[in-house]
């Protein structure tokens, strides 16, 4: 559905240079074309009063299609009672009839010129912005690279600072844990000390009389000690007395031993161990 301009009202005062236009759009019910047209408010009066203006208007109307003419005629018939009603309500319209007619004609000419020029195309050189965009992109990436480099430098500086702090703390810790003594004592490098010579004890140790008295004597110890004493006595007697007296004592001692051996039960029964001889025989053989 197309739209048509039903009414154009322009109020122009003598003191004000700018004009105000009131446009009331109305949709035509019967037309199906998409063309837009302008209808003058007072077309009939302008034709009767201004002859040259009417001629120009006829020329403009000649350029229009027959469909648009029929549409204008229908619209003018429908708008006639509206204009008749508005005229007595607005008495100022009578004073500015000429100005309104001139404006309406100028507007119609402008619309026709626009419609005529709509099909024309003027050649113009294309404007390429790729170079400008490339420059902007280059600047953007350059700034981004500088920002990344600054961040990388700051990160490296922070890492170096942390490393220095750790090394300083480690040195201080080692200094606190340092021992005053040498790590290896001197005796590790010195020769071992000389071992003292062990004195060999004599084979027969002298016995003190106190130990002998305090120790309990067994039967064998008593016999051995008594025999030793007797031997020592006999040796001393031999040196003092003559040989005859010593032989007599020895004979007496031997006789006592033989008598004791004969009195034993084994000798009496005659059952002795093999290899043993009676005491008398041994004494006789000696």
Curated annotation (Swiss-Prot):
Predominantly, its location class is: cytoplasm
Molecular function in Gene Ontology: microtubule binding
- Coiled coil keyword on record: yes
Provide the residue span(s) of the region labelled Disordered. Answer: 31-101, 186-286
A Pfam family in this protein? TPX2
Question: Sorted alphabetically, which keywords does the UniProt record give?
Answer: Coiled coil, Cytoplasm, Cytoskeleton, Microtubule, Phosphoprotein
What are the Basic and acidic residues biased-composition ranges?
Answer: 38-47
* Subcellular location(s) per record: Cytoplasm, Cytoskeleton
Coiled coil segments of this chain: 131-182
Q: Give an example GO biological process.
A: root morphogenesis
What's its job? Microtubule-associated protein (MAP) that regulates the orientation of interphase cortical microtubules. Modulates both rotational polarity and anisotropic cell expansion during organ growth. Promotes clockwise root and etiolated hypocotyls coiling, clockwise leaf curling, but left-handed petiole twisting.
This protein's name: Protein WVD2-like 1
